[in-house]
UniProtKB/Swiss-Prot annotation:
Annotated pathway: Porphyrin-containing compound metabolism; protoporphyrin-IX biosynthesis; protoporphyrinogen-IX from coproporphyrinogen-III (O2 route): step 1/1
KW Lyase (keyword) present: no
Record protein name field: Oxygen-dependent coproporphyrinogen-III oxidase
Positions bound to a divalent metal cation: 98, 108, 147, 177
């Protein structure tokens, strides 16, 4: 179990993504390297890369963190009560890109490795991650391309993984109180160890490496589409759903806040502008209504 190899991959992934997306945007990611003091309950370090007010990205962040703690927080043991009381080591890369143009979709990706340990027992390790697409104005070809890229990334590890991880994503990124999906989904997995450490690590790398080919061509095609105030207003309204999900349901956000993580880095996923309107409904037959009828309901895209 070579966690240093995982760390090296994650740092390289962060570099590759910020370089490629910075080239698309024309802006520069600001790098914030941080360390948690050894006196805090969560120890470790990380590197947060942020681009704000760019030509393409209104806000985008790519964060790497490598942290350790003496006790797993409740969000990490909710599905694994046998791990309560163990110390842990967690490392990962998490990103969210919020484009300025409402016709360009938001994307989220995360890959992570987790080790729970106790002196009198073998360490328990697993990988998690995935990526999902959140359009404001949907294009079937974009959703199909995104899902096709996810499917191709997973195929070498078993044809059953894509449909399984897609369903997991559809179930996970669902706002129960709104009875609607956050976007058009993608793939999601957690507590994954079934292929053994090396092969599971390889699968996680395939997911991380798929982010750029999955999202970059869509952003390149959509970021210059003409738009007006109506589209920006709808984008801000739908971004409100993103905020609701991240603060109410997202396991990564809850884990970070419950374990004493770095708040600025945890909340870098938040959109720069969002709003709420009381009981707003889209006009029937409008492009805004099409998001609800044609894109948010779960469906097979490939």
């Amino acid at each position: 179990m070579d966690t240093q190899a995982v760390r090296a991959y994650l740092l390289d992934l962060q570099d590759r993504i910020t370089t490629a997306v910075g080239t698309l945007d024309g802006g520069t990611f600001v790098t914030d390297t941080w360390d948690k003091p050894p006196t805090e309950r969560l120890r470790g370090s990380g590197r947060t890369c942020i681009l704000e007010n760019g030509a393409v990205l209104e806000r985008g962040g790519v964060g790497f963190s490598h942290v350790m703690g003496d006790t797993l927080p409740p969000s990490a043991t909710a599905n694994r009560p046998e791990l309560a009381g163990r110390g842990f080591e967690a490392m990962g890369v998490s990103l969210v890109f919020h484009p300025r143009n409402p016709y360009a979709p938001t994307v989220h990706m995360n890959v992570r490795c987790f080790v729970a340990q106790r002196p009198d027992a073998e360490p328990v390790w697993w990988f998690g991650g995935g990526m999902d697409l959140t359009p404001y104005y949907g294009f079937a070809e974009d959703a199909a391309h995104f899902h096709r890229t996810c499917k191709q990334a997973l195929e070498p590890f078993g044809e059953e993984l894509y449909p399984r991880f897609k369903q997991w994503c559809d179930d996970y990124f669902y706002l129960k109180h709104r009875k609607e999906a956050r976007g058009v989904g993608g793939i999601f997995f957690d507590d994954f160890a079934e292929l053994g450490f090396e092969r599971s690590f390889e699968m996680m790398r395939a997911v991380g490496d798929a982010l750029l080919p999955a999202w970059l061509p869509i952003a390149e095609q959509r970021h210059a589409t003409p738009y007006g105030e109506r589209e920006r207003a709808f984008q801000a309204y739908r971004r409100g759903r993103y905020v609701e999900f991240n603060l109410v349901f997202d396991r990564g956000t809850l884990f970070g806040l419950q374990s004493g993580g770095r708040t600025e880095s945890i909340l870098m996923s938040m959109p720069p502008v969002a709003n709420w309107r009381y009981d707003w409904q889209p006009e029937p037959g409008s492009p805004e209504a099409a998001l609800y009828t044609d894109f948010l309901p779960a469906r097979d895209w490939v």
